[in-house]
């Protein structure tokens, strides 16, 4: 009879280790197809944006060649025609609309971003249970509201309340040129438009900030608590520094929507071809509302 020799420890380990497999860099056919589809999709977006920029550049070249720098520095918008309907003289200037766009968007960011960040912090670290689910659902739903609803709400409901606050700001801060008014006309001002835009961007910035704050590493939060930090101190020392980049990105996204908003601003703001730096005075406009105003009657040059 043969006696079975027990395997040594090294022989047992060598038997348990599988043979090394050959590593190949050749991708599968499915990976090649997926990569091609993704590449085509990404490049098509760049091509479409490039074609749009090229189209706008070609169409606007004639106006820029005639108006030159006055297209940005002047605020006149006049088209004179003769009896046959032919254009005899035209003057185009976007200065008033550019300033109105800047003021309305700036007011929206100043009011909306702090409220959105505080709301995101509350939803992430303080709200619990059904209250959190309800608030998150409402904020996500508000982000999908069409701008026309915000415009009508601002015109019908908000304008009276905002007019009161505008008068209050003018009363106590009227010595600052920005809050001074040449005439007591407070309705349909850049301030009211900025408040409406702030309410519009709050859901967007809140949703983005909440997602960023949710991604804060748990070990950093627990380390802050282990060192004796309170929840407020933990938020200031850990969450805010970690999510600063995401909050800035959300604010820029909200700023982009505020600067490109059309219907809501057109509903609550007078389109006046006059440079107005007084945010409480009922005159101004923005570029998007000018496009909406002139869309139906614009000539080839406009």
Predicted region positions:
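Transmembrane alpha-helical segments of polytopic membrane transport and secretion proteins
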Residues: 1-42
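Cytoplasmic-entry segments and transmembrane alpha-helices of multi-pass inner-membrane transporters
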Residues: 35, 115-154
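Membrane-interfacial helix termini and adjacent extracytoplasmic/periplasmic loops
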Residues: 66-95, 150-199, 281
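Transmembrane alpha-helix signature in integral membrane proteins
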Residues: 92-122, 251
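Residue-level signal for discrete positions within transmembrane alpha-helices
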Residues: 97, 101, 137-140, 144, ...
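Faces of alpha-helical transmembrane segments in polytopic inner-membrane proteins
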Residues: 112-115, 139-147, 184-210, 241-242, ...
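Transmembrane alpha-helices
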Residues: 145, 205-209, 216, 225, ...
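Interhelical loop and adjacent transmembrane-helix boundary motif
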Residues: 265-302
């Amino acid at each position: 009879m043969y006696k079975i020799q027990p395997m040594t420890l090294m022989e047992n380990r060598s038997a348990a280790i599988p043979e090394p497999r050959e590593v190949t860099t050749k991708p599968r056919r499915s990976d090649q197809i997926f990569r091609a589809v993704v590449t085509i999709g990404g490049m098509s977006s760049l091509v479409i944006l490039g074609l749009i920029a090229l189209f706008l550049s070609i169409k606007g070249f004639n106006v820029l060649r005639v108006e030159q720098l006055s297209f940005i520095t002047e605020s006149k918008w006049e088209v004179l025609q003769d009896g046959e309907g032919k254009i005899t003289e035209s003057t185009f200037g976007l200065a008033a609309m550019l300033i109105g766009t800047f003021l309305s968007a700036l007011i929206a960011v100043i009011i909306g971003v702090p409220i959105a960040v505080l709301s995101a912090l509350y939803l992430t670290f303080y709200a619990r249970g059904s209250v959190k689910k309800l608030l998150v659902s409402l904020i996500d739903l508000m982000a999908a509201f069409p701008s026309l609803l915000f415009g009508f709400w601002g015109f019908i409901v908000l304008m009276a309340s905002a007019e009161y606050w505008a008068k209050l700001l003018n009363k106590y801060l009227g010595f600052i040129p920005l809050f001074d008014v040449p005439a007591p006309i407070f309705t349909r001002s850049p301030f009211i438009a900025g408040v409406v835009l702030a309410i519009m961007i709050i859901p967007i910035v809140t949703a983005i900030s909440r997602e960023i704050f949710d991604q804060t590493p748990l070990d950093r939060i627990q380390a802050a608590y282990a060192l004796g930090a309170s929840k407020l101190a933990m938020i200031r020392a850990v969450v805010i520094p970690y999510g600063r980049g995401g909050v800035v990105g959300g604010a820029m996204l909200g700023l982009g929507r505020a600067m490109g908003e059309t219907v809501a601003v057109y509903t609550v703001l007078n389109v006046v071809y006059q440079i107005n730096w007084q945010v409480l005075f009922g005159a101004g406009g923005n570029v998007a509302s000018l496009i909406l105003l002139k869309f139906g009657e614009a000539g080839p040059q406009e």
